[in-house]
Amino acid sequence: MAAAGLCFILAIVSSTSLLASVPVSALVEDLDDSFKENRKDDIWLVDFYAPWCGHCKKLEPVWNEVGIEIRTSGSPIRVGKIDATVYSSIASEFGVRGFPTIKALKGDMAYNYRGPRTKEDIVEFANRVAGPLIRPLPSQQMFDHVKKRHPVLFVYVGVESTLKEKFIEVASELIVYTYFFSASEDVLPKYVTLNEVPAVLVFKDSTYFVYDEYEDGDLSSWVNKERFEGYLHIDGFTLYELGDTGKLVAVAVIDEKNNSIEHTRIKSIAQDVAKNNRNNFHRDFQFGHMDGNDYINSLLMDELSIPTFVVLNTSNQQYFLPSKHIENPEEMIQFINSILDGTAEAQGGDGILQRIKRVFYDAKSTVVSVFKSSPLLGCFLFGLPLGVISIMCYGICTADTEDGSEEMTRKDVIDQNASDEGSDEEEEKGREITDVSDEDQQEKDFMEKKID
């Protein structure tokens, strides 16, 4: 027995050593034009990148780790990367519009990855998409095991039906976000009661909810809204995904490192309202908290002091702020009700003035971030163009002044010449008049003598 265990350990060590000796390029394949024809035979996880893209370079070591993780797990998924600037026709075929773009390709389906760019999240996404759309739960033990691993669980209960066809259709659309399962009624926990079968359930927040077509509307919309827990730790990626739900996002903005009563109180109040007022607010609001105000400030183009509470409308960029600090759940409920009845004043928006403000705010933020990260680079990037523009303006102004002075000098010369010519003419006329006067005088004197 000990010998068998030793052999097993040696086998693992040898296989790990062998894998470690394999270059990363063998685990992450560089793709070319042939990929277009050969891809349908396998499941692919592909990174579409551009050589000049900074985010692509940052993703590269993570992508290599993804290749190693998937290969060591024995997954059938093949990991590759393709230069979208060289093979632009392939990038266009898959609708690549930005870099990096991560896609899972399975048959004729292409799934976009929009989550955090970490090894764990990318691998989890790839394995979810590569597996079956609907995963069966044959026993209660399997159900309990899966429920512990997934905070949100969608389960179809029943035999073949129109509802199951819709469930499969929704799964093919939303498998990029969550898992979908099927089970018989006897596999479910004892506390679950169903009025009718077939049914679709979601297990989350230590309870379950049953889909009601009459109250909840379209199954796809219901799944899209229910795929989040009732209270979340919200970051930029989560907030982006919450935009698809159509809900307002109620966020307690705090500093998680600050254990003062002000920070812990606003978070606990938000949790309390989310849990105890689900029936009133769940359809319209998603509750959560955000660590730090940097992201929220850039989103709102404002400087929020923390701790605070803000409600975001991601569809039109509007937001709502309470008129005073919230001290208890009753005040938070009152504030949320004022949003529902339209008495709360909305700020922000996506109008023309706000778009212009966004342009200037983004420009300011870019300049500040560059100077903070590298003052010398900032001086070079912004000082050099300003210097060139200043020299050009000075040259233009100086040229105008010199031209004006030269023009005035020419005018003065012309005026002086004209004045001199006028004086000469007057002097000549004077001489002529004098000559004429002398002749007249002589003639007059002659006539007087003749008379005498």
From Swiss-Prot:
Domain Thioredoxin as annotated: residue spans: 27-128
TM segment ranges: 376-396
Cytoplasmic side of membrane: 397-452
Biased amino acid composition, Basic and acidic residues: 443-452
Active-site residues, record numbering mapped to chain: 53 (nucleophile), 56 (nucleophile)
A Pfam short name: Thioredoxin_6
Sequence ranges on the Lumenal membrane side: 27-375
Stretch forming the signal peptide: 1-26
Superkingdom of origin: Eukaryota
PANTHER family (UniProt xref): PROTEIN DISULFIDE-ISOMERASE TMX3
Name this polypeptide is given: Protein disulfide-isomerase TMX3
Organism: Xenopus laevis
Lineage: Eukaryota, Metazoa, Chordata, Craniata, Vertebrata
Gene name, Swiss-Prot/TrEMBL: tmx3
